[in-house]
Amino acid sequence: MTLLRDLGMNSIRLRVWVNPSDGWCNKSDVVAKAWRAHQLGMRVMIDFHYSDVWADPGSQYKPAAWIGLSLDELKTAIADHTKDVLNALKEKGITPEWVQVGNEITPGMLWDEDATVSGATYDVPKEGVTYAKNEKNFADFITTGSNAVKEVFPNAKVIVHLHDGNNNGTYRWIFDILKANNTPYDVIAMSLYPGTDNWQEMVAACVANMEDMVSRYNKEVMIAEVGMPWDEPEISKSCLTELIAKSKAIEQCLGVFYWEPQSYGSWNGYTLGAFDESGKPTVALDAFNQ
């Protein structure tokens, strides 16, 4: 964390899993990391996945302990989990500036085959199973998480986060659903993973999307995730420099987070970090210190 701060990063984004098998990213782990960041003077974002494992466009599975709950019980579980983690931070004197309620939730969240308790935004076919669409539940789950955040930290900004930040149609679809359901939130956050051969086009589309979200929904915006191939550091630096500059030009844009900067080389099969195989940061991260 100290190295990343010295490289120009002033904020950290920490994911929360409900009951991970190895303990990483559970409540105590998140509090420990947030405390370290707090001691370094960094701003903190908490990212609730509402899952025991990674939640992303291909995986929005319920925590094992929540399977079989009724709709009301599920909402209670969302609220209790959210408040439990945030109160643990509060007890340590840590105030997160932003809180995500769900991670890359374009296909919804807390999938279930039973439409009455599913939060999918469309019928999601996965491995011979179809997780049922229920837009109302999807919006209600976000509302539940948002209200829980505000109960503990009234001034924290609630984030709704989708993938494919360059896809304006997707964002209009999801945020029209939330608007129709009067869902409370503060910030629209995006992921963007450009290729080395199309980054100019993707950055331009993402910036246009941010501008449209500000205009259409009167919300602040943010890049919650951006990543580029670690072994193309100069191209990555050019992309990040342009994205950061254009984001700064949007008054309502709150910032840009890299994910996952300290992933080195192709560690664990992931190639979009910003450290090389020797464990040193590449020049890509110079973009954060300009």
Where are these regions (language model features)?
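Short amphipathic alpha-helical segments and helix-helix/interface helices
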Residues: M1, V31-A34, S146, F175, ...
